[in-house]
Amino acid sequence: EGNDNTVDVVFDVVEEKTLPVTITTNYLTIADGYILYSTDVYKENITLSGPSSELDKVATCTAEVTYSGELTESITLNTPLRFYTSGGKEVKFEYTELEENSVDVTLQVYKMATLPVDVNFINAPRDFDDSMLVYALSRKQLKVAGPAAKIDMLSTLPIGNIDLSTFTLDKIGRAHV
């Protein structure tokens, strides 16, 4: 006793398993006036190599993105990978080797704004004052989102041109925004 001269030996079949990386953003705070527009992961699939007894337990691979502050701009974060059983229990590997321990996740954070809609009149007669035109828009303003630098440059949302050379009374036009 006191002198243990034994070795544990594990016999198993070594396999490879490839899993898609799922991104979760449950632990992020997005600042007021901003939205998380999209997430992109640098590596979409991860390959594991190890004993089948360990790999058989794994159902999902997750990159759980965390950030300590409020997000107001796009950012890329190195995010550790976590593996779960089909029942949601985290799997800790003893013998399995990971192709990657973490992945880079890019979070596209966009600023939101409500902007007045603006139409442009083209082919008007010379010295024509388009402020004298009476017209109605189905929407006076629209909510938009985009990179903060672009949104901050906008004071109105241009939705298209109305060609006065082809204009007729009671005409209804559509502009896709």
Predicted segments with their positions:
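Structured interface patches
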Residues: 1-174
